[in-house]
Amino acid sequence: MVLSSTNVATRIRLGALILLSIRLGYSAELKPETLTAWDDYIAQETAQVKQRATLDKGFLWTDAQPNRYNDIRNGGTVVEPMGEYNPLRVEGGLIHHWISAVFIPNAHIDDVLAITRDYAHYKDFYKPGVADASTISKSDAKDEFTIRFVNPSVLSKSSLQGNYVSNFYRLGTNRFYSTSVTTSMCEIKNFGCPNEKRLSQDQGSGYIWRLYSTARMEERDGGVLLEMEAIALSRGIPAALRWFVDPVVRRVSRESIEKSLNDTATAVHARLDACEAQNPHQIIGAGNCSQHAGNSDLRAKRLAGDAGR
């Protein structure tokens, strides 16, 4: 959800973003004009992401206002909607765009990437929203992976299976950004039941049709400042229900991206603690904890233990 791998944190929670409390009883159709509006929006966003990467000042959204960094540096998580209208109504759908930032003390960029690229343990890091995740292919600059996340609504036994491509860019020694986009998104009806059925892409409820995210990181002040920017395309909301559904969507959007970022920070700290316990005389830093075998399983067990307390 930062949207790429790091973004996946946000991507995952965006599965809970649309109509969590309401089950609309009919399917939604993804229209060509809806997809065109989405493609245009993402093209503009991609251009802005690339422009930010060239800036010495202005790379991070956080630095645009001094109070943001002060709040984040003091342990807060800042979450804000992007754009004048959020969600943005387009023909046949809605575009949801949010950004969030958090400071992870005593960490390096590689420590964060060790979590956000560890897809096999997403179900531990980001539960209960993630049912499963796995790597399709992996390289220094690009990952392909799949995530199945569940709709936590008690009114609907549904799941979404998404395939993603993330691209990674290092900017010197202390900056990094990544982008992530869905290559396919399929709804799974009757999730976990004997009659479970995977629908074709763009069929079903239309809770989530497309996802795009960006993650930006900078090492400073003894830690990592992590930003996640997440964008989702969903079905439109019938006019008769907007008065009730719109506030729910905005509230859940804010809570979801905030939880994603906090889950990532928690997983990073658990990883560092586990590495230190395993290697008490080693100076941990710059991601070198990941060089020790077994740390993924160890930190997954640590997270499971923390959740059970």
List each model region and its residues.
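Charged, low-complexity surface segments at secondary-structure and domain boundaries
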Residues: 1, 22-30
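N-terminal secretory signal peptides that target proteins for export/translocation
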Residues: 1-10
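Compositionally biased regions
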Residues: 5-6, 22, 291, 297
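Generic hydrophobic-segment detector
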Residues: 5-6, 17, 41
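Intrinsic disorder/low-complexity segments in short proteins, especially the signal peptide
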Residues: 8, 24-25, 308
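Bacterial N-terminal signal peptides
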Residues: 11-23
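Eukaryotic helix-grip
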Residues: 28-309
